[in-house]
Amino acid sequence: LIHSGDDAAKADLLPGIAAGETIATLAFTEDNGRWDEEGLTATATADGDAWKLNGSKSYVLDGHTASLIIVAARTAAGVSLFAVDGDATGLTRTALSTMDQTRKQARLEYSDVSGTLIGTEGKGWDVLSRVLDLAAVALAAEQVGGGQEVLESAVQYAKDRVQFGRPIGSFQAIKHKCADMLLEVESAKSAAYYAGWCAAELNEELPSVASLAKAYCSEAYFHAAAENIQIHGGIGFTWEHPAHLYFKRAKSSELL
């Protein structure tokens, strides 16, 4: 909405989102899994002053609970963005069961669903490209936070857990693991910080830097989460310990 250039839509929709009264999401990915302009096949057809949307979207975060859905669909002029009410007639929403058990993803099916055009018809892909870059930077920062959390958890457990008469953190094998985790997490921070600067400047480096940051930070997070379980041993493999949650979240973040 912010980058759409549609002042009327911003004035109408942003206050509710900012106040937490409106749960909003972006319906972009389709069954083909493509993240490119030609991969968008859902359609929107003009119907007087309104638009009718048809097609399906998959892996939509909070798609089954959102009260506002921004949908990317193809019109005669190209990819465009539309605001759709979460309870709109003709919209079928199905929650997806995911490995991380958050149940935040959904499949959405549109059958002559009414939507309101946001911004300029045919200019939706330009907006999406920028938004996806900014989202990649935000995800990289989230991955750094997760990596930092599992690093601290592993180090603390290595100090507390005693084996063979001394803390396991005093053994070289564990020290190497913690050192590798620290190296990756700190490197990920640097990548995320630089990507954040590019996002703030909206400079020409943003697309490539955002992709690089997300790729590296996701790998660092997943490796740190896996090593955290290894250092914790048996308890790290139980449902009662949060290590498994970070492991699954780290894996899911690699796919986003």
Report the location of each language-model feature.
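Short beta-strand-to-turn element immediately C-terminal to the catalytic PLP-Schiff-base lysine
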Residues: 2-5, 45, 71-74, 83-86, ...
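Alpha-helical interface subdomain recognition
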Residues: 4-9, 16, 20, 46-51, ...
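A generic local secondary-structure boundary/capping motif
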Residues: 13-15, 32, 41-43, 57-61, ...
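A short, Trp-centered hydrophobic/proline-enriched beta-strand micro-motif
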Residues: 20-29
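Structural signature of FAD isoalloxazine-binding scaffolds in flavoprotein oxidoreductases
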Residues: 36-40, 84, 248
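Cytochrome P450 C-terminal beta-domain/meander region
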Residues: 36-54
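Flexible, small-/acidic-enriched active-site or ligand-binding loops
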Residues: 39, 59-60, 86-117
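A short core secondary-structure module
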Residues: 54-92
